């Protein structure tokens, strides 16, 4: 799958860029106000008790700031953070090596925690509840259990698929925080802040236009801003103006709803070739040349959220709103 401008997952070259933009304190974090308010209380209470923060589960769509929040939690608690991904913890020994190296109060951040193997997850249970590990050494008759005491720590788990977590793991998190898509006002503020970090001026109309097309996701907003900045610099404009912004987004094929060429390809397939549906997912996949799982996990959720697509027992179906929007878009292109 080619990387898309509106893909909510991080592109391979974006790690350093994202790191440079991330706020380090709650007061700098824009949006997610309910989560910020709750975390302020939980962190202050934990510090007053001189205890580590309770284990935190962060869940929601990609690109909304779960990794950023994990680092902010560590900064606010004034402790170190160790970051790993669920798939990288293949054996209980991998987890034991990391946990035994933590200092009291430290934060362990496990991204994609829903992808932990069952054997690693079972070792994690006593570590979360009672701060010890039971490790089996040897095999057969010579196998024996060794108990390793751990310093109190905070586990922050992040997932885009909270429903894929097992009940026992989910229940061991004392704090559950769901990140929601950002509103346009917060995205506008994020875009203006990012422009300042990049040393680029931007007019308010451009910030609003970018916010509208960012799919409620800061990662997408920052990516679009970077590309529009390219056009501004080539044009030798003193700042990003609305004319340049609209021109750039048009060439990037990101429309006013944040839909790109793949979204248009998929919806036009349903509307034009299959009379609006219902049509089976496998049929759509073959017609547009994409994998079924990619359509289901990457393309569909936003189209459904925006009211353009319905899932029915008989297949996918275009909504009246889809007919209105895509017919108009096709006329403009013609």
Swiss-Prot record:
Ubl conjugation among keywords: no
Region of interest (Head domain (RuvB-H)), ranges: 256-334
Cross-referenced CDD domains: AAA
Region annotated Large ATPase domain (RuvB-L), chain positions: 1-182
Pfam hit, one: RuvB_C
Assigned EC number: 3.6.4.-
Enzyme class label: hydrolase
Annotated catalysed reactions: ATP + H2O = ADP + phosphate + H(+)
Function in brief: The RuvA-RuvB-RuvC complex processes Holliday junction (HJ) DNA during genetic recombination and DNA repair, while the RuvA-RuvB complex plays an important role in the rescue of blocked DNA replication forks via replication fork reversal (RFR). RuvA specifically binds to HJ cruciform DNA, conferring on it an open structure. The RuvB hexamer acts as an ATP-dependent pump, pulling dsDNA into and through the RuvAB complex. RuvB forms 2 homohexamers on either side of HJ DNA bound by 1 or 2 RuvA tetramers; 4 subunits per hexamer contact DNA at a time.
Descriptive protein name: Holliday junction branch migration complex subunit RuvB
